[in-house]
């Protein structure tokens, strides 16, 4: 039996009919804050408001619903960093199917709990592997041994067709408002979302530039399509943007993206954190890191999109509140507002007061101070964190620190030491 490896607009139209009474038609909103900031019209497709707070329900339900009754009776499995799993268990509950969900050990607790919440007694969650790719290998082995049905999160034409319904829905909404998009920005993890969207847009909105956005620490599609012209596996990835941190994209999504995606943007994880905080404070939108990728990319395209009409897909809103401290920390470091030093501190009374008076600027703030006293020496080691009011103050701060201790270590520039702090 030949396995289908292409996706057509007909496939997406058929998926749209299957999903019509299952998924929520999420809003397409003109965002006034971003429109003013970038001097253009920025629309947001709010998939963070989907039933499982992610677009993944579309692909999961479509892929499961096309299984035969015999296949469904054997149960389903999936590997996911969170959102695809929620789509699968939501579907399993609706169709009363047995499901085993494999998730990386590093998955935020909030996403693990949400999977259990959306599922039922027929759903089992297995935490295994440090990355999605390790987790995937375990899931495939289990699926084969138990003769179940693996629901691929991206490298499956039915999953891709389901994600493509987002594009059909978006174009119908924009047509009713007489809106034509010049640019579309969407996140890339394994490539299912961008493959489905781009397939539909290239047929029904061919003048729209499709921009795929990846975290800089996991740009597997860019490395495969642009750099190597073949699917490659990244040896190491940054797992912070957990919903889009994939070391290897799908063979099917690679071919579709290669044909349809006009350009790729890699966004620093710190910039994503700044976007998350900005969206929350300015727009009251709770976006997860992968969900904020599309908006983060606008800064890279600010000269191109001026005066244009843009749409960003907010792909998910399953953010763990316990991560907010780390998100704020990464944002401050990226914006060059927080700086860490290792200093030799004189072991005598008044040394700290001298440091505060002589080194800190009038608006600087100490956010971390760890002191290791050494009884047999004249100085002790201090790790200190300083937050600035203006990142332009850094040059003068470093000059004053160097005067206080010429042998100091600036931790922000030391990748290994820096990684220990965040």
UniProtKB/Swiss-Prot annotation:
Biological processes per GO annotation: isoleucine biosynthetic process; L-serine catabolic process; threonine catabolic process; threonine metabolic process
Keywords from the named record: Amino-acid biosynthesis, Branched-chain amino acid biosynthesis, Isoleucine biosynthesis, Lyase, Pyridoxal phosphate
Cross-referenced InterPro entries: ACT-like_dom_sf, IlvA, Ser/Thr_Dehydratase, Ser/Thr_deHydtase_PyrdxlP-BS, TD_ACT-like, TD_ACT-like_sf, TrpB-like_PALP, TrpB-like_PALP_sf
Protein's UniProt keywords contain DNA-binding: no
SUPFAM superfamilies xrefs: ACT-like, Tryptophan synthase beta subunit-like PLP-dependent enzymes
This enzyme's EC code(s): 4.3.1.19
Residues recorded as bearing N6-(pyridoxal phosphate)lysine in the entry: 56
Enzyme class label: lyase
UniProt pathway annotation: Amino-acid biosynthesis; L-isoleucine biosynthesis; 2-oxobutanoate from L-threonine: step 1/1
Keyword rRNA processing: no
Pfam family, one: Thr_dehydrat_C
Needed co-factor(s): pyridoxal 5'-phosphate
Domain ACT-like: 339-413
Similarity comment text for this entry: Belongs to the serine/threonine dehydratase family.
Its biological purpose: Catalyzes the anaerobic formation of alpha-ketobutyrate and ammonia from threonine in a two-step reaction. The first step involved a dehydration of threonine and a production of enamine intermediates (aminocrotonate), which tautomerizes to its imine form (iminobutyrate). Both intermediates are unstable and short-lived. The second step is the nonenzymatic hydrolysis of the enamine/imine intermediates to form 2-ketobutyrate and free ammonia. In the low water environment of the cell, the second step is accelerated by RidA.
Protein's name according to its UniProt entry: L-threonine dehydratase biosynthetic IlvA
Species of the source: Staphylococcus aureus (strain bovine RF122 / ET3-1)
